[in-house]
UniProtKB/Swiss-Prot annotation:
InterPro entries: SAM-dependent_MTases_sf, tRNA_(Gua-N-7)_MeTrfase_Trmb, tRNA_methyltr_TrmB_bact. GO terms for molecular function: tRNA (guanine(46)-N7)-methyltransferase activity. Keywords: Methyltransferase, S-adenosyl-L-methionine, Transferase, tRNA processing. This is tRNA (guanine-N(7)-)-methyltransferase.
Length: 251
């Protein structure tokens, strides 16, 4: 006997809870599965998400994630917010099997593409979430639990009246600091100079973060950060790219 209860976790997906019972009718457990709405997702992406969400996906919850249980080890965890289509995130996870990666993306086709690429490359040290990043940071990430935070090419909201919509704000950086372990890093990159200047201002103003730049501003693109499609696009348009790398001080 099974009973389905459908609840919408957000506007782009729905969660189906299936109650399982023993042969004599006693309640056994509930199994949560990830079911997608049709839309811009390709059939391939939809199938990859539905078939692999149990091993690669995480759901928002109101308590902190147990990373040791999730990944099966105590390796350092690096969080990336807004991974786009996920190619560079998967490549970083593939190149660093001694680290665990957690990616947040609200664009469902990007999540589907990331999962598909992770399955293709047989990546085991990666989990993804399709949810609002601020809620994940607030509710799901314990303080002093992240080895690093990556934010590559976020929406610049280049109009002045929209600057308040930028994810990089003083309160956001303060929250990141709480989640980082001592010597944990914040790595940001953008191809908008004005946003780079704003990122630098906010990060520099944060008490407890140290800029690793020799010139006290930006660093050259490190070899460990793969070129993203946004960066390649920026190069074609003649845009510069600015990397910022800060470390949380030991107190």
């Amino acid at each position: 006997m099974t009973e389905q209860k459908i609840t919408f976790a957000d506007q782009k997906r729905k969660t189906v809870e299936i109650a399982e019972f023993t042969e004599d009718g006693r309640y056994k457990r509930k199994v949560r599965s990830f079911v997608l709405r049709t839309g811009r997702l390709s059939e391939f992406q939809r199938n990859m998400m539905n078939n692999n969400w149990a091993t690669l996906g995480l759901e928002y919850q109101t308590t902190a994630f147990d990373f040791t249980q999730i990944y099966g080890n105590t390796n350092p965890v690096i969080l990336e917010i807004g991974f786009g289509m996920g190619k560079s995130l998967v490549e970083m996870a593939l190149q660093n099997p001694d680290k665990n990666y957690l990616g947040i993306e609200v664009h469902t086709p990007g999540v589907g593409a990331c999962i598909a690429y992770a399955v293709e490359k047989q990546v085991k040290n990666l989990r993804v979430i399709c949810h609002d990043a601020t809620e994940i940071l607030q509710d799901c990430i314990a303080d002093n639990s992240l080895a690093g935070l990556q934010l590559f090419f976020p929406d610049p909201w280049h109009k002045t009246k929209h600057h308040k919509r930028r994810i990089v704000q003083p309160h956001f950086v303060e929250k990141i600091q709480q989640k980082l372990v001592p010597n944990g890093f914040v790595h940001m990159a953008t191809d908008w100079e004005n946003y780079a200047e704003y990122m630098l201002e906010v990060l520099t103003s944060a008490v407890g973060l140290r800029n690793t730049s020799a010139t006290n501003d930006y660093i050259p693109r490190p070899d460990f950060r793969p070129l993203t499609k946004f960066e390649q696009r920026g190069h074609k348009l003649g845009h510069g790219v600015w990397d910022l790398f800060f470390i949380k001080n030991i107190t």
